[in-house]
């Protein structure tokens, strides 16, 4: 429900939105291809994707992109759920962990500590990309 409210607000100010029903999905902005995921696929994974890119995660997303015909001059994997921000450069894509807009719950506090909310954003202008953070 919250994602639909945010979508309506963003569309009211002229920002195009897309809400996916898939655990991993992708979209393009010019030559920039974004593959995005929740921190974990509850159906196929025991553990979350890591904060920073490792060999296993690099292989996982490389294979996913190949199987789903994902191409682009600039490729990014953006995932959430660890309530921290990190940017890692891989062999064929950049791997970005983004903070949680939600902040803390009892479960989050017990597992990650008392985390504050944050929003990470990317601005695309031709071949250039800038990334920023708004946080509490």
Walk through the language-model features, giving the residues of each.
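C-terminal lobe/lid and adjacent interdomain/linker elements of RecA-like ASCE P-loop ATPase modules
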Residues: 131-136
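Short, surface-exposed beta-strand/loop micro-motifs that present aromatic residues
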Residues: 24-26
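Conserved beta-sheet core of the metallophosphoesterase superfamily
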Residues: 12-15, 21, 33-35, 40-130
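Short strand-coil-strand connectors
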Residues: 28-31
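Active-site neighborhood of divalent metal-dependent phosphoester bond hydrolases
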Residues: 1-18
């Amino acid at each position: 429900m919250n994602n639909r409210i945010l979508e309506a607000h963003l569309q009211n100010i002229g920002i195009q939105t897309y809400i996916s029903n898939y655990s991993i999905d992708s979209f393009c902005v010019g030559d920039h291809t974004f593959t995005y995921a929740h921190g974990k696929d509850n159906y196929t994974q025991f553990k979350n994707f890591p904060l920073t890119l490792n060999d296993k995660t690099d292989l996982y997303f490389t294979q996913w992109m190949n199987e789903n015909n994902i191409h682009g001059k600039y490729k990014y994997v953006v995932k959430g759920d660890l309530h921290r921000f990190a940017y890692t450069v891989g062999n064929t894509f950049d791997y970005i962990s983004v903070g949680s807009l939600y902040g803390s719950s009892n479960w989050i506090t017990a597992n990650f500590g008392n985390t504050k909310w944050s929003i990470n954003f990317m601005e695309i202008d031709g071949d250039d990309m800038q990334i920023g953070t708004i946080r509490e």
